[in-house]
Design a protein with these regions (language model features):
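Pre-Walker A (Motif I) flank of P-loop NTPase domains
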Residues: 4-9
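Glycine-rich phosphate-binding P-loop
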Residues: 11-26
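Glycine-rich phosphate-binding loops of nucleotide-dependent enzymes
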Residues: 23, 34, 44
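ATP-dependent small-molecule kinase phosphotransfer cores
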Residues: 37-85, 89, 109, 121-122
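Small-molecule kinase domains that catalyze NTP-dependent phosphoryl transfer to phosphate-bearing small molecules
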Residues: 64-65, 123-169
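Conserved phosphate-donor/acceptor-positioning beta-strand/loop module used by diverse small-molecule
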Residues: 97-119, 123-132
Length: 182
């Protein structure tokens, strides 16, 4: 559970909807840290004194459940507070009492174009990645909470980034937080 008075913002969303970009802009504006699977894996590697390859072997051998490992570390980050948790990692924390939960979505073609540009892959491959990611996220939320990840009742704010640029999305969230300070 987060410490009282400490901001913890979750920004889960669809692959290619701009979760990382929005989280980064928001964190810069508010002086918060961005947390995602990459940050968590780096922390695990440092804390355990292991390598990425050794960690991958432990996970692939079934010695440890990857999602449980990521979730436990993410819980430590939200306990510390002053973080924006983004992407798939944020989906693992939807059951936690946090400051704000913002879901980012966008049209599939828009997301595929972003993924193709970012990863320098063709649009067909990007579409497949978007579809795989949607299915992975669907299964994850269903497994953890027995709900659809597209159930808007899970989130406080929902933003369509195919219509609202990431800079504006970050500003909307920042403004919401300022207006709703207790």
């Amino acid at each position: 559970m987060q410490k009282p008075g400490k901001n913890v913002i979750l920004i889960p969303g669809m692959l290619g909807a701009g979760c990382t970009s929005v989280a980064t802009k928001l964190a810069e504006a508010l002086g918060l840290r961005v947390v995602n699977s990459e940050v968590i894996i780096r922390r695990i590697v440092v804390e355990k004194g292991t390598s990425f390859l050794e960690l991958a072997k432990i996970v692939s051998d079934g010695e440890v459940e990857f999602e449980k490992l990521i979730r436990n570390e993410a819980l430590d980050f939200i306990e510390e507070g002053e973080v924006v948790v983004e992407g798939r990692t944020a989906l693992m924390l939807l059951d936690q009492p946090v400051t704000l939960k913002v879901f980012l979505h966008a049209e599939k073609d828009f997301r595929a174009k972003r993924v193709a540009e970012r990863r320098q892959i063709d649009i067909e491959e990007a579409l497949r990645e978007v579809e795989r990611s949607d299915e992975d996220r669907r299964r994850l939320v269903e497994k953890l909470y027995g709900k659809s990840w597209l159930d808007l009742g899970l989130y406080d704010v929902v933003i369509n980034t195919s219509r609202i640029p990431v800079e504006v999305a970050a500003k909307i969230i920042e403004t919401y937080l300022q207006v709703n300070r207790k």
